[in-house]
């Protein structure tokens, strides 16, 4: 007996993270860069196949014209509020992240709200 259900879907891989994929991630921490004084490092935690992956994104405190600012970066988070003056309210919240890869290292290419998307679906 054959059917065509799922015929065109890829079977999920048990491989580690894959670049250009979107994952649900928790913002684990924000700290100063060990390499550059003028950057904050956002560390997101992804749990995949029972393994924990920490993926980072560095954002410049004083961005150039072609760089994203910290305020712009935070606006993409699930619980963004202009009234937040510290990172504490963002920690432990879930977000969607797009993972990139550069020279064998993973990084967060982009972030999007997860909770607001789920609320919108419930309210429709």
Report the location of each language-model feature.
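Short beta-rich binding modules
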Residues: 1-124
């Amino acid at each position: 007996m054959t059917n065509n259900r799922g015929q065109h879907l890829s079977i999920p891989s048990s491989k580690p993270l894959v670049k250009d994929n979107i994952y649900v991630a928790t913002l684990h921490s924000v700290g100063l860069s060990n390499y550059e004084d003028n950057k904050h490092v956002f560390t997101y935690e992804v749990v995949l196949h029972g393994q924990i992956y920490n993926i980072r994104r560095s954002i410049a405190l004083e961005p150039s014209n072609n760089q994203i600012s910290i305020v712009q970066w935070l606006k993409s988070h699930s619980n963004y509020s202009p009234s937040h003056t510290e990172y504490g309210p963002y920690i432990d919240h879930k977000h969607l992240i797009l993972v990139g890869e550069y020279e064998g290292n993973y990084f967060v290419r982009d972030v999007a709200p997860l909770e607001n998307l789920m609320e919108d679906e419930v309210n429709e």
